[in-house]
């Protein structure tokens, strides 16, 4: 009985660790993607501002 309960707990813990690792890798991708989008927005803004200055 103890061994069966112990295996069940270990199985739950390993499943949680697996899900946590999936969420972690997804978080890293999302963080990198949002950082990339912010950089693109800044570049676009600077191009618009500097482009207007050069045209004047």
Swiss-Prot record:
GO terms for MF: neuropeptide hormone activity; peptide hormone receptor binding; pituitary adenylate cyclase activating polypeptide activity; type 1 vasoactive intestinal polypeptide receptor binding; type 2 vasoactive intestinal polypeptide receptor binding
Protein's organism: Heloderma suspectum
Any one of the GO BP annotations: positive regulation of cytosolic calcium ion concentration
Sequence segments annotated as region (Important for receptor binding): 42-50
UniProt subunit comment: Interacts with ADCYAP1R1 (via N-terminal extracellular domain).
Domain of life: Eukaryota
Sequence positions bearing Leucine amide: 50
Family in the record: Belongs to the glucagon family.
Source taxonomy: Eukaryota, Metazoa, Chordata, Craniata, Vertebrata
InterPro entries from the UniProt entry: Glucagon_GIP_secretin_VIP, VIP/GHRH-like
Record-given protein name: Pituitary adenylate cyclase-activating polypeptide
